[in-house]
Amino acid sequence: TVCEVLKEQNCLHQGETPYQIQLRTFEAMKRDMFPYLTDPDVFEVPVGSIEFVEAYLRKMYGIEKMVPLLVPIQLDIPEYLGRKDALVSSKSELREKASEWGAEEIFLKSASQLKCDYTGVYDIRKDTLPSDKEMYISEVLNIFSEWRVFVFNERIVGVKHYLGDPWVMPDKSVVYQMVREYTDCPAAYTLDVAVAADLYSGKSSTVVIEVHPFVS
């Protein structure tokens, strides 16, 4: 199995980095287990962690890395956001934007990599703010429940509860409207939505959190 191959490679090459082991493992799998991968007419879908998928795409197709989709421009409107958001490139710019919003806390994540170790809510008055060249920030929402919507060829194929109260469900018509309006999209993606208190009206509404490549 793939797990057995990975364990064997980890054991045989303990002095190498995980990335080097991944590349060596792919070569072994390609040669011994999946010789048909050399056939250009065959397309395989890697299943695993983001790190695994990125290493696979890099090795097999020369794709260096996947870029976060964040909130696509077609969905980045007040009707769907329920909050303010922005892209910033420094701590000073981050603080300026938060001050403009009148916010003492902001949600922050990387705008250049799918997974990072600093995603979270930060108090802008403290010195613990991370520093990065490309960061996505937004006002902090009061979220009651969060859901992941699976979309393939612009059609919803599944919905999964993600966080919060599973009995607080998103507005079906709003979710379908988001999918219809997000036309500049990949063939397959996931749409994270939440039921949250609107920061301005206080009313509960269905909002977009972010969009991910389908590997998420």
Where are these regions (language model features)?
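Active-site nucleotide/adenylate-binding loops and adjacent lid/helix of ATP-dependent enzymes
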Residues: T1-T183
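Conserved metal-phosphate-binding beta-hairpin within the catalytic cores
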Residues: F150-V151, I156-V157, P186-S216
